[in-house]
Each structure stands twice: as structure tokens, then as C-alpha cells.
């Protein structure tokens, strides 16, 4: 027999099937998806690869076919359906097959099982008493102590015996040899969630919730599988609807995957699912230990778990009978991978569901333009929930023009209106959230005389000032001491653009010394359980004000929060990205949804320098329809997704001149082969950051009405790049409908 193998080398020229002979000793245990050790190249270097299929026939000269050395015993095998999914992802998004295979295999190495030992008493009550008397007579205190404990509790934890009873291993062995007890071992799964109590709490659903639940249940039980878009305002009870949908699927003996956009959402989301489904729920994220991740994947593979919750990578959970994929907050950009293959979880979920006879539910208060566009075309079933589940009123929104604040002499980042409302909420013993889409103690350093901005020498991005007198590059990690005079003109009038979460925290503490303030951003959430600790502390009312980046306004439910302040609402509005209006609208609308979720009315303050922008106006009015209509006209006029499709050809090289020349040839090739295809080629151009770690970057954008047209173009470009030696020093990647330009 022979095996088709993809070698574990990420090079385009080796991205093909290599056939190997299977030795007799491995024929019974080798299966597709296993990692194997193989001789490769002229020197027969031992490398690893993945078996994609087995065959009885050889496609090459038999005398030249090499033999597999062994199976990689410590690796996790990829299931056949995930191999097929990887092949589809390679075709759709580019990259190599080995990159795609590693993407669909979140856990690559086996981990040693965690074993728990017990001591079990083997004697009858009468025999035990006789033995105890014997040990006491012989003054064998440790043996007597252990046997006495076993008489009271016939099964004892091994660790308790050795630590609490102070009994050594030789004593335990002696009693085992005498037939008094037996040492038993069992495998224990590492559960990353400490609380797992199931509670039957009756939920009274609104008419809107019932309509969605019944519609889904009717479809599912009739065998209809489709993709649903659930557009529900913040607080409308989308999570309760998800759980009822999952219950329908689980009752049919199937499993469900629930994707979340950020690790910060895991704690609250998982607790709600645990209360509903108990320990049949599991969690997967990057902060778990290798052992925890391995245990949860193996439980899912064996069908011991009904629901897997996690970020994008949880999409590849190897459930035996997948019935439903839920993508909560589907508009979030974190669902798009920035690593090759640059897939979008929404598209891969829809494809996996089609293959495995499952349904997909996309949920959001601010659906992505792509999802709503497809729903309007009839590709997705649209459900809408326009009211909050407990009939709370939507928050009152105030838009503050910061230009007027400056004219009135207020140079603080907190407007007079916001300061007034914060004081009011503190007096009322209510909670406040203040968010800023910035990281670090402050922003960039600029000279007020010549305008020079201090940048990273390796990345062409501004350095940010952090506490401790350091200036840091957030792209490559470069650090240098804080400058005291301008390196360009020598002026001492150089300083920070003050807009960082640490800076806001300090200002709030100074302005409201009586307030207890917590901060949540990338710097305060680096440790494993830091998200959980900060969110729990705020939920338990251990703080009055939570200051943070955009992660604090996404999906969290704090009933005591009655005021939300968006401190720099338009900071993301004029980035070099066609999605900037959409992102600003989504962020502000999500922020507005955090206020007034309990029985108290909520208020939101949006601080902006451009109150007339349609994204600001629509978010203040919480009017998705108004925003969508204006935004889709803009996308249609400019030929941007979702109306048309966009492919970014990303090229990188250490030699800037060679990079410019190669990109020119690439563009000429595209224009030469496009024929009658409707293509619009833009560039080559410099991306927002044109150099990272001394590697220069350029990008060519190609627009086309049909996605398939771009896939075919990508395939031909890959062939062109492979046969032309001029591209050997280049790294070229493809990104379809990129989230960032």
C-alpha cells in the first residue's frame, strides 16, 4: 500500500502530494490524517508530514518510491472531513496545504493524561477491626492511622492520605501487599472552568424571541438546514435564543459550536451556558494550558461534550455529529484570520455546515455589511428582535461636540456633560464605563514647532510613550528612552498626544478621588485569568468606574451600569480603511447598549469632533437601517465589498527596489491575462505600515464582481510566481475581502 503525504515544509514549490510506500508493520495502524516521519530529499533527511489518503496503486516509478519511517506517535491525527475542509480553504484563500492543515488542527501534540489515584479498602468490617487491633498492638501507628481512616471512608484520595494523614508510600505499599487495600487510578480531564453547576431556571421569552426559536425549531426538525442572521438590539436576549436553538440540536443527539469574538467574552458567556447545560459545555481559547486544550478537544471528539465555546479556532472542533454553529457578535473583525490562510470564520462555518448537514446562526446588534447584504439577497434567513427582552428603554444618547468644549476652555478629554453625569452616578451608587480605542499610557510623541513625529526605525509607525520613561513600537516591540528634545529641529516643545487608557485612568482618579477605578486593556489582561478577575470585580461592584479599550463594551452585561462614555468616538473614523465608518458605527452602538441593562435607565455620552458624520448620527440614534442604507450606497459607488469583491496581493521583501520592480511585473501580468474578466486593478501602493522589522511591504488591490474570478486569478498568479526566479526573495500572500487595508 501507498500513502499520499503533504510534507511539513511551508514552501510553495513543495506544496504538492508526495507518495510513500507503507511498511508492512504499519499497514494496520496507519490512517489518513496521521502525522508520519519520512525520508525527504537527496540526503533522505528525516522530516514530518501528514497522510491525506491511502492507495493500492503507485503513481510513480516503484524503484524510486521511498518508505515511511514511522508514525509520529505523539501527534494528533486530523479527521478526514477536516482534511477536506483544509483543501477547500487552501483553494479559497491561498497559502499551502500544510498551512491549511495546521489551521484546522488546533491541538497538534498529545499531552500526558492527568491521573488521579484512590485507595480502596478490600476488607470486610470484621476483618478491618481485627487488622486494626493487630497494628495497634504492634505499635504500627501509620498503618493503624490509614486503616482507621479507610474504615470511616472506604475510598480515600491518594493525595489526601499522603499529605493530610502523613502516610508514606512504603506504608501504602505494605498494606497493598497484605491485601488490605488497592491503589486505583483514573484519568481526570483538566476542566478550565471552575464553576459547572447546572440550574433549571425558567425563562419567559418575549414574542420576538419565541418567533425566532419556533422558526428555527420547525426548520431543524423538518430537516431544513440554512444560515440565519439574527439582528437583535443590545439587550434583546440573543444569548437565550442561542441556548434554545442549541437545546433543539442537542435533543437530536447532535453537538453545537459557539464562537465568540474575544477571550474577554468567555467568562460571562460560558457561565450562562454552564447554568443551562452543565458540564456538557467546554471551552477553548489560547490562554488554556496545552493539557487543558488537549483534554477538551478529546472530550469533544468522543462526543462527551455537547457545546464547545471559544474564539475563531473553536470552529474546527472535531465533533462526531455537528448540528449547529453559532457566531455571536458576527460583525467583529477578529473572525478574520491575519495568518495564512486568511480565512473568515463566517465563510468557513457556512461551508462546514453545508458539508456536515448543520445550520449556522449569525448574531449581532450591528450586523456586518456582508451578512446583512446576503440576508437582503435572500442567501440568509433574516430574523429581527427590535426590543430589549425585559422591556427596558434604550439608553438616552448625548452627542458632545468637542470643538465647542475646546472653545469654551475645557482642555480635558472629559467633556463638561460627561463630568456632570459621572458625578451624578457616583452619588447614586451606580456604575460607569469609559472607553477609548487606544492602548498605552499616551499616544504618539510630536514636536509642536516642526510637527515631527518620533517613529520606530524599523516599522515607520509612531512610538507610544509608556510609564517608566519608555517609548515602545506596538508592531515589533522596539524600545527607546523618552526624548526630551526634537531629534529633527532640536526644540524642547515635544510631547505626547495624551489619549491612552492609563492616562484616562489617572485623570479620572484625580478628578473623582472618591471613585474606585478599574482599568481593562491589553496591558492589564496579559495573565491567564486577568479578564475574569477584572470583569468579576466590576460585576461584584468592587469598582465604580471601568476604564478601558473597546474590549469593555463588547457583549458584557452589567445591570448596575447606567452611564457609558465614548471618549474619542471618531478616533477610528478617518483611518485609511473603507470599513472605518462601519467600525465606528458598530463600536458606538455596542457601547450604547452597555448602559441601562438593569432596571435603571441608561445614558450614553458620545464625544466627537465630527458630530455631523452619518456614522456618528446613526449610532447616536441607534438606527441601523439609516446607517446601512448610506453605507451600502458608498460601497456600491466605490466597488467595495460586499457589493463587489476585493483581493489584496501582499508583497514583502528586504530589498525595496526589487520589491517595486516585482510589483510592477505582477500588475502587468494581471492586466495581460485578465481578458474579458471585469477587473479593476489598483496600485502597487504602500499599505498603512510600509515597513515592519526592516521588511518593506507593498500591496496591489484587485476588485471584481464575482469572488470566483479572484480565486482563478490567484491560482494563475501563484503559478506565475513559482516559475519566475525573480520572485524567490519575495514573500507574496493573498487576502480576500481584507478586514484592514
Show which residues each predicted segment covers:
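Solvent-exposed, membrane-proximal periplasmic/extracellular interface segments of envelope transport
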Residues: 55, 59-72, 687, 692-705
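A carboxyl-terminal module marker
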Residues: 668, 672-692, 696, 717, ...
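A general secondary-structure signal for short beta-strands and their flanking turns/coil
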Residues: 2, 15, 44, 429, ...
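Accessory, non-ATPase domains that flank or precede helicase/AAA+ motor cores in DNA-metabolism machines
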Residues: 1-364, 376-392, 676, 711-715, ...
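A short, contiguous, amphipathic alpha-helix enriched in charged residues
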Residues: 2, 6, 31-32, 658-671
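Inter-lobe coupling/hinge segments of SF2-like helicase ATPases
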Residues: 200-206, 210, 224-660, 672, ...
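A general secondary-structure junction signal
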Residues: 53-55, 105, 185-187, 436-438, ...
Amino acid at each position: 500500500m501507498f500513502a499520499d503525504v503533504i510534507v511539513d515544509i511551508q514552501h510553495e514549490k513543495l506544496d504538492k502530494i508526495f507518495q510513500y510506500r507503507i511498511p508492512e508493520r504499519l499497514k494496520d495502524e496507519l490512517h489518513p490524517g496521521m502525522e508520519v516521519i519520512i525520508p525527504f530529499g537527496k540526503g533522505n533527511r528525516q522530516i514530518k508530514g501528514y497522510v491525506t489518503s491511502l492507495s493500492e496503486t503507485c503513481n510513480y516509478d516503484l524503484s524510486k518510491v521511498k518508505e515511511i519511517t514511522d508514525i509520529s506517535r505523539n501527534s494528533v491525527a486530523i479527521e478526514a472531513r477536516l482534511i477536506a475542509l483544509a483543501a477547500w480553504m487552501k483553494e479559497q484563500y491561498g497559502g499551502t496545504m500544510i498551512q491549511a492543515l495546521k489551521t484546522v488542527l488546533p491541538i497538534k501534540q498529545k499531552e500526558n493524561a492527568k491521573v488521579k489515584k484512590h485507595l480502596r479498602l478490600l476488607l470486610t468490617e470484621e476483618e478491618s477491626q481485627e487488622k486494626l487491633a493487630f497494628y495497634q498492638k504492634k505499635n504500627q501507628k501509620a498503618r493503624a492511622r490509614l486503616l482507621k481512616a479507610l474504615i470511616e471512608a472506604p475510598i480515600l484520595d491518594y493525595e489526601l492520605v499522603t499529605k493530610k494523614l502523613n502516610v508514606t508510600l512504603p506504608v501504602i505499599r505494605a498494606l497493598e501487599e497484605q491485601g488490605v487495600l488497592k491503589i486505583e487510578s483514573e484519568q481526570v480531564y483538566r476542566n478550565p472552568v471552575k464553576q459547572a453547576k447546572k440550574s433549571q431556571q425558567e425563562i419567559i421569552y418575549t414574542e420576538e424571541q419565541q418567533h425566532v426559536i419556533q422558526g428555527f425549531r420547525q426548520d431543524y426538525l423538518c430537516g431544513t438546514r440554512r444560515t440565519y442572521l439574527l439582528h437583535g438590539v443590545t439587550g434583546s436576549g440573543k444569548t437565550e435564543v442561542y441556548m434554545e436553538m442549541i437545546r433543539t440540536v442537542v435533543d437530536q443527539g447532535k453537538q453545537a459550536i459557539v464562537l465568540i469574538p474575544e477571550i474577554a467574552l468567555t467568562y460571562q458567556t460560558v457561565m450562562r451556558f454552564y447554568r443551562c447545560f452543565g458540564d456538557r459545555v467546554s471551552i477553548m481559547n489560547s490562554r488554556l494550558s496545552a493539557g487543558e486544550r488537549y483534554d477538551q478537544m478529546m472530550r469533544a471528539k468522543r462526543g462527551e461534550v455537547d457545546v464547545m465555546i471559544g474564539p475563531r479556532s473553536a470552529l474546527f472542533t472535531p465533533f462526531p455529529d455537528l448540528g449547529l454553529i453559532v457566531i455571536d457578535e458576527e460583525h467583529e473583525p477578529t473572525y478574520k484570520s491575519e495568518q495564512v490562510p486568511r480565512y473568515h470564520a463566517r465563510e468557513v462555518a457556512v461551508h462546514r455546515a453545508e458539508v456536515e448537514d448543520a445550520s449556522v446562526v449569525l448574531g449581532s446588534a450591528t450586523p456586518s455589511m456582508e451578512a446583512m447584504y446576503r440576508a437582503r439577497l435572500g442567501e440568509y434567513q433574516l430574523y429581527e428582535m427590535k426590543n430589549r427582552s425585559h422591556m427596558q428603554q434604550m439608553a438616552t444618547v448625548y452627542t458632545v461636540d468637542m470643538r465647542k468644549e475646546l472653545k469654551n476652555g475645557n482642555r480635558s478629554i472629559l467633556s463638561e456633560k460627561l463630568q456632570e453625569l459621572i458625578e451624578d452616578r457616583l452619588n447614586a451608587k451606580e456604575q460607569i464605563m469609559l472607553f477609548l480605542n487606544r492602548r498605552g499610557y499616551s499616544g504618539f510623541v510630536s514636536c509642536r514647532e516642526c510637527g515631527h513625529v518620533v517613529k520606530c526605525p524599523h516599522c515607520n509607525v509612531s512610538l507610544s510613550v509608556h510609564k517608566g520613561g519608555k517609548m515602545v513600537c506596538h508592531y515589533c516591540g522596539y524600545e527607546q528612552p523618552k526624548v526630551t528634545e526634537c531629534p529633527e529641529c532640536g526644540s524642547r516643545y515635544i510631547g505626547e498626544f495624551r489619549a491612552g487608557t492609563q492616562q484616562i485612568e489617572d485623570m479620572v482618579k484625580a478628578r473623582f478621588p472618591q471613585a474606585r477605578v478599574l482599568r481593562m486593556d491589553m496591558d492589564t489582561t496579559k495573565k491567564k485569568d486577568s479578564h475574569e478577575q477584572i470583569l468579576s470585580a466590576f460585576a461584584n461592584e468592587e469598582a465604580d468606574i471601568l476604564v478601558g479599550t473597546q474590549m469593555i463594551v463588547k457583549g458584557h452585561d452589567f445591570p448596575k451600569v447606567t452611564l457609558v462614555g465614548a471618549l474619542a468616538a471618531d478616533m477610528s473614523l478617518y483611518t485609511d480603511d473603507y470599513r472605518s465608518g462601519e467600525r465606528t458605527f458598530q463600536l458606538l452602538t455596542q457601547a450604547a447598549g452597555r448602559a441601562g441593562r438593569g432596571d435603571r435607565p441608561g445614558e450614553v455620552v458620545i464625544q466627537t469632533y465630527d458630530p455631523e458624520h452619518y456614522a456618528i448620527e446613526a449610532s447616536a440614534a441607534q438606527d441601523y437601517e439609516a446607517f446601512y442604507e448610506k453605507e451600502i450606497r458608498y460601497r456600491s459607488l466605490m466597488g467595495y465589498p460586499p457589493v463587489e469583491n476585493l483581493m489584496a496581493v501582499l508583497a514583502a521583501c528586504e530589498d525595496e527596489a526589487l520589491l517595486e520592480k516585482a510589483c510592477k511585473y505582477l500588475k502587468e501580468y494581471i492586466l495581460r491575462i485578465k481578458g474579458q474578466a471585469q477587473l479593476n486593478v489598483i496600485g502597487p501602493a504602500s499599505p498603512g505600515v510600509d515597513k515592519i522589522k526592516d521588511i518593506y511591504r507593498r500591496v496591489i488591490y484587485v476588485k471584481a464582481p464575482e469572488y470566483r474570478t479572484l480565486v482563478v486569478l490567484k491560482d494563475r498568479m501563484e503559478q506565475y510566481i513559482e516559475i519566475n526566479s525573480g520572485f524567490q526573495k519575495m514573500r507574496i500572500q493573498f487576502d480576500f475581502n481584507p478586514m484592514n487595508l
